[in-house]
Amino acid sequence: EESNKYEASRILQDVGNKTVVVNPPYPPMTQGELDRSFDLPYTRMPHPKYKGKRIPAFDMIKFSVNLHRGCFGGCAFCTISAHQGKFIVSRSKESILKEVKAITEMPDFKGYLSDLGGPSANMYAMRGKEEKICRRCKRPSCIHPKVCPNLNTDHRPLLDIYHSVDALPGIKKSFIGSGVRSVSYT
């Protein structure tokens, strides 16, 4: 239950003569903080210890762009909300386009983005209409068993990103390779 809260409490559990302490996660980043984290000088290359070996997982993500952090799906089998939180923090359009432009300049880029998504691709820019309601909420999922009436499910910001990326010089096609979740009221 604590992992579903915006501001969780520390959990203490006695085990024998010791106490296990689980500290609460940091609050979600701001968009500016997230953008700055993506502005760091990443090489987009595997660790040097692989010395030219093929890494199948790297092939899959080499030309991918992460649009946001977090997932409000609350799927029982998944740990994204435990690692990134259930509250979506999205990168700015400018930050995303800057990264895509950098990818188009990579020597082996052929014009195809393998994934323009995130933990759950279509949750970009979605959040509660009234944050104070979200801060009190303990539900593990904002979409199951029913979509929360406080959830903004507007896909237009995401569609704008898709159209803007596809219009860039050097982009032939972009794909959505990460999970798409149903966030509609139907």
Residue ranges and their predicted role:
Residues 82, 127-141, 149:
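Short secondary-structure boundary/capping segments
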Residues 82-112, 163-164, 168:
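Conserved alpha-helical substructure of the radical SAM core
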Residues 93-100, 141-163:
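Phosphate/diphosphate-binding loops
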Residues 104-135:
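Terminal amphipathic helices with adjacent charged low-complexity linkers/tails
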Residues 112, 173-175:
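Structural preference for beta-strand elements that scaffold enzyme active sites
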Residues 185-186:
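Conserved small/polar residues in nucleotide/adenosyl-binding loops
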